[in-house]
């Protein structure tokens, strides 16, 4: 970023511009490439990772910063954060070919990750490797959208795989048993609950014991959490794996 004279002109390079018209004037914010769609899809939540500079422009390419008077007149406020959020939510932006390809690839990888985390082969009762999910999605003609979240598209992908019968696949849940020291159990309880679909049993006596239903993708997170926080003294045991209720 280069700041140049006169004051009020800021020149940016390698930028994705979000444009928004309000109150008869044009306003723009300068963002990093690939980040606007991620922010709208709630993949990226840190505005500092989205914005190249925390300011509002009349024209990014010319480096013209919007005046406080123009902002107040158009938006009814000169609160930069509120104005930036409105522009990001409602503004238009163009996506270049390289940026579009990056977005599509990133979203596709996220979709595959969600599908492998939520599903299993009903015959083996085990999750599919990502490579098999990728091939099945390709064979059934699944197409990626950059305007929808990866999770919502993963649910669509699962439905399409089931309809096309490319591979036997069902939504899955694992029943697991977690045993840790009472003190550690009280400390971990809320985090374990946030990762579980359902808590079937929970006992706190000489030790903390919990029977929970989780999606396959969260089993690894729970196992790592318990091992790290208990220094390998806790236990996570898989009791069974079954088709999830729909």
UniProtKB/Swiss-Prot annotation:
UniProt xrefs under Pfam families: SBDS_C, SBDS_domain_II, SBDS_N
Keywords, sorted A to Z: Cytoplasm, Nucleus, Ribosome biogenesis
GO MF annotation, one: guanyl-nucleotide exchange factor activity
A Gene Ontology cellular-component term: cytosol
Major location category of this protein: cytoplasm
Cysteine pairings via disulfide bonds: none
Example of a GO biological process term: cytosolic ribosome assembly
NCBIfam families: RNA_SBDS (TIGR00291)
Assembly behavior: Associates with the 60S ribosomal subunit.
Family: Belongs to the SDO1/SBDS family.
Known role: Involved in the biogenesis of the 60S ribosomal subunit and translational activation of ribosomes. Together with the EF-2-like GTPase ria1, may trigger the GTP-dependent release of tif6 from 60S pre-ribosomes in the cytoplasm, thereby activating ribosomes for translation competence by allowing 80S ribosome assembly and facilitating tif6 recycling to the nucleus, where it is required for 60S rRNA processing and nuclear export.
Name listed for the protein in its UniProt record: Ribosome maturation protein sdo1
UniProt organism field: Schizosaccharomyces pombe (strain 972 / ATCC 24843)
Gene coding for it: sdo1
